[in-house]
Amino acid sequence: MTKFIRIACICLLSILGVADLQAQDLYFVDAHSQFDQEVEGSFIIKRMDEGGVYKTILASRGQRSPGDAVVLAKKYPQRIVASVRSKGGPYANNSPKFYKQLQKQVDSGKFGAMAELLVFHAQKGDKADQVKMSLDDPRVQAALKYAKQEGWPFVVHIEFASLKGVERNDYLQQLNKFVAANAPLPIAMIHMGQLPVQDVAALIKAHSNIYFLTSHADPVSAENATQPWINTMDGDKFKPSWKQLISEHPDRFIFAMDNVWAFQWQDTYLRHIKVWRSALADLPPDVANAVAHGNAEKLWKLAPKP
């Protein structure tokens, strides 16, 4: 009996060792992040190397110009994909300048993605104003036209957890209509749309072209949060309902970090990677690889890591 227990323990440790090795070997593609004047490109690459992130789809923000993302992509062509910048004053004010900047970026041929379109963005203290518009807004439709032209997934930012009652239902109806009307173009909800698992499941069932970016959907973002992030995990493992949904639809979930502020690159980056690496290690390898990098590579037509 003692010998049997010893053998069983060795086998279990062996299995756990393989799982741990697989988790460490897993690489990531960050399908949506941003950087401003407080973050240097070399530091982004350093963080990516430390976290096992092979590629980042990156947009400029703040005082950085769209060209700064292009420069970084040219310097690190295997690691950075420049994303067309959408947000900023011209977007918020619906200025003619927004449409000119959008066209200039796309026509340059130097970008490989379209950054998120803010449709409903709740006030974030004194750091970010509320943005509120419909999916039929000319700004959204202009960016959508270019995404279709270039064959890029269209990333939508609607914070459903900050919407209530009739307004929430209206945005959900808008989203269903928008996704259906634009099939087969992939429509990706950043921050999982801040939607609970049952709503995500319903949208997946209703539409073959809706996807969910995992940014800020973990305990690192939920910790001391003033925003109603959707936390898919208990500790560093998926909650059962999320684990089941991701396992059943591994092609619909895409790893993304959406680093916006300097502290997210500097202080929390590796913590996010650690919890996602641990949570994904609990899933079959094909599922983990799809979420971590495979789905982004397929949808944005990115070369996998050699």
Q: What kind of feature is each model-predicted range?
A:
Residues K74-Q78, V84, Q130-I254:
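Catalytic pocket-lining loop regions of alpha/beta-barrel enzymes
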Residues T2-F4, L26-Y27, S42-K55, A59-S60, ...:
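Mid-to-C-terminal alpha-helical segments outside catalytic/metal-binding sites
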Residues H32, M48, M114, A147, ...:
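Conserved, mostly hydrophobic/aromatic
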Residues A31-Q34, A59-R61, S83-K87, E116-F120, ...:
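Active-site-proximal beta-strand/loop segments in catalytic clefts of secreted hydrolases
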Residues V18-A23:
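Sec/Tat signal peptide C-region and signal peptidase I cleavage site
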Residues A8-G17:
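Bacterial N-terminal signal peptides
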